[in-house]
């Protein structure tokens, strides 16, 4: 049975007019529809997405629903802008269900303009522990959590924008020699303990490191700026864009601006004093950063709490020698 996707979106977005933490309780059947329909769309599109600018890129959201709505208030609700999200929609925050349902609804409504990559928290072994399973169980059922798992197992893991900006949740892999390898990953798939898929969602850049190192997370690797440079040169790319780590200013460059980390959950978990950021890429691949400050006392967004960072604009010229 098909559901009215516009009505579902309206129900979810209407929350912006109420208290920031107000729950939106869709029916079990509506959520199953969102999962099964978006799953089909994910499978109809490549594992490595080939996208075109202009678009806006967002990092981790982690169940911070009111902050997701603030990002859309600022960047424009779809279809006013094209979006690429880099994963980690669920866990830790209080409203993972609202976050993932709205993102899936937009994916269904605008399949060619709205894109969602898989993060390390879109795997059952992780979101079983860090909050999403408990939220599903408390508000709906374990069965519904399993329906989400079936959908997560089909999400794409990487994207290339205009053949120049390579995007993923985590980072590079020592096993990644050709981008075609990503295309060949068979879905549905769970996360392996090692290898290419694991690294794409788990690895981290590390300052003062040359080559590959052990990751303190106990999974995957860390990599140095030299690894980034060699990879970009080999594949004729200009920039790696990833999420996965809290950064104080919402975005942080690494290795002579050859890699950028974007994190979009301000005041993460209520414990970090970070701002969130969203990266806008225009037709000329000029990247600018929009900063989302923590909402004071969780008020609705005001113009004073969001401002564009003009000084941190990075021009990506379409050449190897960026």
Swiss-Prot record:
Give EC number(s), comma-separated. Answer: 3.1.3.16
Q: Which InterPro entries match?
A: Calcineurin-like_PHP_ApaH, Metallo-depent_PP-like, PP1_catalytic_subunit, Ser/Thr-sp_prot-phosphatase, STPPase_N
Region of interest: Disordered: 298-322
Q: Does the keyword Lyase apply?
A: no
Cofactor binding note from Swiss-Prot or TrEMBL: Binds 2 manganese ions per subunit.
Where, in this chain's numbering, is Mn(2+) 1 bound? 60, 62, 88
Alphabetically sorted, this entry's keywords are: Cell cycle, Cell division, Hydrolase, Manganese, Metal-binding, Mitosis, Protein phosphatase
One GO BP annotation of this record: signaling
Ranges of compositional bias, category Polar residues: 301-316
* Record-level GO cellular component terms: chromatin; cytoplasm; nucleolus; nucleus; protein phosphatase type 1 complex; PTW/PP1 phosphatase complex
**What are the binding positions for Mn(2+) 2 in this chain?**
88, 120, 169, 244
Q: Which Pfam families match?
A: Metallophos, STPPase_N
List the cofactors. Answer: Mn(2+)
Question: Which reaction is recorded as catalysed by this protein?
Answer: O-phospho-L-seryl-[protein] + H2O = L-seryl-[protein] + phosphate; O-phospho-L-threonyl-[protein] + H2O = L-threonyl-[protein] + phosphate
Gene Ontology molecular functions: metal ion binding; protein serine/threonine phosphatase activity
Which family, according to the similarity comment?
Belongs to the PPP phosphatase family. PP-1 subfamily.
What is this protein's function? Essential role in cell cycle control. PP1 is perhaps required for exit from mitosis.
Q: What is the official name of this protein in its record?
A: Serine/threonine-protein phosphatase PP1-2
Report the gene name: sds21
